[in-house]
């Protein structure tokens, strides 16, 4: 698995591996998304992480597909429900978490890739708006208190990334979601161990 210690999408896969009992079957190798010399671009032409490189040299990407691959290896239906009545709500919740992570990463790259003072405040506001609307939706309809599926994993990784990169600023205005994350972390093996560093 090509990833980085700070990637929320990589964390999602590491957490899925832990929950599925597959962690010991996967080697994790660092990937530098900003280095054009990194073999990452041969493994995923988009140069994005995570990427799962299989024994035959072929690659699977992105995190949604990798998670489904591992769920399939574990017998299916463990993290992604098979029943359409629960499958599509779970995948929709995961899409909301992925969208929050996408917007947070875009905010991070906007400040990281520009000289000080050159980042676009309009772009930052657009991404911040996506994050805030996503958090508001989650605050209004909290994820499951008992589930450890694709939706809950993805939302928890999104919130963890906001804590890591934006000093937990979201917490003040989303108390119900803060409580949910604390309860999720307490019942989810591997959540603390996969925290971004």
Language model region names:
Residues 109, 195-197:
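Short coil/turn segments at secondary-structure boundaries
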Residues 7, 84, 149, 174-175, ...:
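Serine-centered coil/turn micro-motif
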Residues 75, 102, 143, 189-190:
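Generic structural signal for secondary-structure transition and capping sites
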């Amino acid at each position: 698995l090509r990833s980085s210690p700070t990637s929320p999408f990589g964390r999602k896969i590491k957490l899925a591996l832990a929950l599925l009992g597959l962690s010991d079957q996967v080697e994790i190798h660092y990937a530098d998304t900003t280095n054009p010399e990194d073999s990452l671009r041969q493994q995923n032409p988009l140069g994005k992480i995570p990427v799962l490189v299989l024994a035959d040299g072929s690659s699977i990407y992105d995190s949604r597909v990798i998670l489904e691959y591992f769920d399939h290896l574990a017998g299916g239906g463990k993290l992604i429900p098979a029943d359409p009545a629960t499958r599509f709500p779970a995948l929709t919740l995961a899409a909301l978490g992925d969208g929050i992570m996408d917007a947070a990463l875009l905010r991070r790259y906007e400040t990281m890739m520009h000289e000080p003072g050159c980042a676009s405040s309009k772009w930052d506001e657009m991404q911040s708006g996506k994050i805030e609307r996503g958090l508001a939706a989650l605050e209004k309809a909290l994820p499951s208190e008992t589930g450890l599926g694709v939706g809950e994993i993805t939302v928890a990784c999104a919130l963890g990334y906001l804590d890591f990169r934006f000093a937990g600023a979201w917490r003040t205005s989303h108390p119900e979601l803060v409580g949910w994350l604390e309860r999720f972390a307490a019942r989810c093996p591997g959540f603390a161990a996969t925290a971004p560093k």
